[in-house]
A protein has these predicted regions:
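Loop-to-transmembrane-helix entry motif
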Residues: 133-140, 197
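A short amphipathic helical element positioned immediately N-terminal to and/or at the very start
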Residues: 125-133
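Membrane-anchoring alpha-helices and their flanking helix-loop junctions
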Residues: 1-119, 123-126, 144-211
Length: 211
């Protein structure tokens, strides 16, 4: 099997693995342990949260469909740019590292993990990966998305990266407001000390986090 055939076979397998290990299994585990739902993007009273939830769902479906089309049709049909194999293998490494980051962060969140903003109170997690950045799950997912763009570089995949950054930036700001209301000074001190997606970058002054 040549390298191109391997890439075409591995991409949809990787997409399914990500959905299984990063979404389906953690959701089932949380429901079994706590009786609560993990997906709460649609429950928020703020209609903007629901719009973000729909866009996130479409984004995931789009990447999954892209993976399947890449396997079925090949790079030329999708307008994938020819790039050195080294960049594509770097992309695979980024996808693997991003998935590991997501899984570790989910385990460290424990019963506090949600997809979206839950009306029910959850504990503030500030240790482990969360002592390095406030949003390691979103950061790990960005590694996965950028890695996929390196494996199948095209106008579509790099636009997907930009879309992901926009959606996550909007979602994180809603979550920051919610956490400030829920945890008060404890969250404001944490947000002033720890970066948003990168260590030391995106720390908030107390005035920026409204309660």
């Amino acid at each position: 099997m040549d390298a191109e055939s391997l890439h075409r076979l591995a991409l949809p397998v990787s997409a399914v693995a990500f959905l299984l290990f990063a979404l389906v299994l953690p959701t089932a585990r949380l429901s079994r342990r706590t009786g609560r739902a993990a997906f709460v993007l649609h429950r928020r009273a703020n209609p903007f949260q629901r719009v973000i939830g729909v866009c996130m769902g479409l984004f995931i479906l789009g990447l999954t469909a892209w993976s399947a089309l890449y396997a079925a049709l090949g790079p030329e049909s999708l307008g994938v740019w020819p790039v050195p194999d080294a960049l594509r293998w770097l992309g695979w490494a980024m996808m693997a590292a991003g998935l590991v980051l997501v899984l570790v962060a989910q385990v460290q969140m424990g019963a506090s993990w949600r997809v979206g903003i839950d009306r029910e109170p959850t504990a503030l997690v500030t240790d482990g990966l969360f002592s390095v950045v406030r949003n390691p799950i979103f950061a790990g997912m960005l590694w996965v998305v950028v890695g996929m763009a390196c494996v199948t570089p095209s106008a579509w995949t790099w636009m997907a990266c930009a879309d992901y950054v926009l959606l996550v930036s909007l979602q994180v700001r809603l979550e920051e407001e919610h956490l400030a209301r829920l945890h008060g000074p404890a969250y404001r001190e944490y947000a002033a000390r720890v970066g948003r997606f990168l260590p030391g970058v995106g720390r908030l002054a107390a005035a920026e986090v409204t309660a």
